[in-house]
Amino acid sequence: MTVERTLSIIKPDAVAKNVIGQIYARFEAAGLKVVAAKMAHLSAREAQAFYAVHKDRPFFKDLVDFMISGPVMIQALEGENAVLKNRDLMGATDPKKAAPGTIRADFADSIDANAVHGSDAAETAAVEIAFFFPGMNVYSR
């Protein structure tokens, strides 16, 4: 087992539903520790930069518009196999295909408003965490 970090974003739809605490409880119940966290209202520039990997995809503009539509809760999570564990907690990107009991099955409205973002690999997680938490403000506990 490998202790690793992953980035999680609770998206504007889930923040608006006031389910941050319920989502955090799921992280902690799965053995993931929140090692950095902040609430932010992303600018268009920040959202475009963060999701730049998708810039040529047809959904890019809608994704950026959604991510700047309200505040988001951004956290770095740490634990055994954190990337996979978080992805299992999130469920399928399309909440209609997400397994019952996953975050997206329980809190997401659509494939666009799908409640959460999670890093897809440890390497991606390192880049994503550095994007939102540059410097020395991520603390193991």
Curated annotation (Swiss-Prot):
Enzyme class name: transferase
Alphabetic keyword roster: ATP-binding, Cytoplasm, Kinase, Magnesium, Metal-binding, Nucleotide metabolism, Nucleotide-binding, Phosphoprotein, Transferase
Biological-process GO terms, alphabetical: CTP biosynthetic process; GTP biosynthetic process; UTP biosynthetic process
Pfam assignment, any one: NDK
InterPro entries (alphabetical): NDK-like_dom, NDK-like_dom_sf, Nucleoside_diP_kinase
Transport keyword on record: no
Predominant localisation class: cytoplasm
Positions of disulphide bridges: none
GO cellular component: cytoplasm
Keyword S-adenosyl-L-methionine: no
Localization annotation: Cytoplasm
MF terms (GO), sorted A to Z: ATP binding; metal ion binding; nucleoside diphosphate kinase activity
Cofactor: Mg(2+)
E.C. no: 2.7.4.6
Top-level division of the source organism's lineage: Bacteria
Catalytic activity: a 2'-deoxyribonucleoside 5'-diphosphate + ATP = a 2'-deoxyribonucleoside 5'-triphosphate + ADP; a ribonucleoside 5'-diphosphate + ATP = a ribonucleoside 5'-triphosphate + ADP
Subunit structure: Homotetramer.
PANTHER family: NUCLEOSIDE DIPHOSPHATE KINASE (PTHR46161), NUCLEOSIDE DIPHOSPHATE KINASE DDB_G0292928-RELATED (PTHR46161:SF3)
Similarity-based family: Belongs to the NDK family.
Function (record text): Major role in the synthesis of nucleoside triphosphates other than ATP. The ATP gamma phosphate is transferred to the NDP beta phosphate via a ping-pong mechanism, using a phosphorylated active-site intermediate.
HAMAP family the UniProt entry points to: NDP_kinase
Protein name: Nucleoside diphosphate kinase
